[in-house]
């Protein structure tokens, strides 16, 4: 029969799982932002080779709307700036979460070593 983990360890493991889930969600959002940034950069690159008076269409909902190059570039650059700010914010949050996870993992390992000083004989792996 497997030994039950002490409540303190269980609480720390639950906190660890919450932080891990939070990091996973953050990484997914960050990936989405990075993909959108790549797409915006590609579009801006394509726009740069067009004449200023070129006919441009953009998607608005379910419609294609005629627009001018300057306003589309401004819109894309504004969106790019916002996404870059979000990306930097997510990068900082990711660093903080990774540090918290690392610290919590060390704390859990320390707690486990106090409860199970023989190590591998209990069947618990950190």
UniProtKB/Swiss-Prot annotation:
Described purpose of this protein according to its UniProt entry: Molecular chaperone capable of stabilizing a range of proteins. Seems to fulfill an ATP-independent, HSP70-like function in archaeal de novo protein folding.
Subunit relationships: Heterohexamer of two alpha and four beta subunits.
CDD domains: Prefoldin_beta_GimC (cd23162)
GO BP of this protein: chaperone-mediated protein complex assembly; protein folding
Full protein name: Prefoldin subunit beta
Record flagged with keyword Magnesium: no
Top-level lineage group: Archaea
GO molecular-function term, one example from the UniProt record: unfolded protein binding
A GO cellular component annotation in the UniProt record: cytoplasm
Family designation: Belongs to the prefoldin subunit beta family.
Subcellular location, principal: cytoplasm
Organism: Saccharolobus islandicus (strain L.S.2.15 / Lassen #1) (Sulfolobus islandicus)
Taxon lineage: Archaea, Thermoproteota, Thermoprotei, Sulfolobales, Sulfolobaceae
Subcellular location: Cytoplasm
Annotated keywords: Chaperone, Cytoplasm
């Amino acid at each position: 029969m497997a030994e039950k983990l002490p409540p303190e360890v269980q609480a720390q493991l639950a906190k660890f799982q919450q932080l891990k889930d939070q990091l996973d969600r953050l990484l997914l959002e960050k990936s989405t932002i990075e993909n959108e940034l790549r797409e915006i950069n590609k579009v801006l690159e394509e726009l740069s080779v067009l004449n200023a008076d070129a006919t441009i269409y953009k998607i608005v909902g379910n419609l294609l709307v005629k627009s001018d190059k300057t306003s589309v570039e401004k819109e894309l650059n504004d969106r790019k700036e916002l996404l870059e700010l979000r990306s930097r914010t997510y990068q900082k949050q990711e660093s903080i979460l990774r540090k918290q996870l690392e610290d919590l993992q060390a704390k859990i390992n320390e707690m486990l070593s106090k409860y199970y000083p023989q190590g591998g004989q209990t069947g618990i792996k950190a």
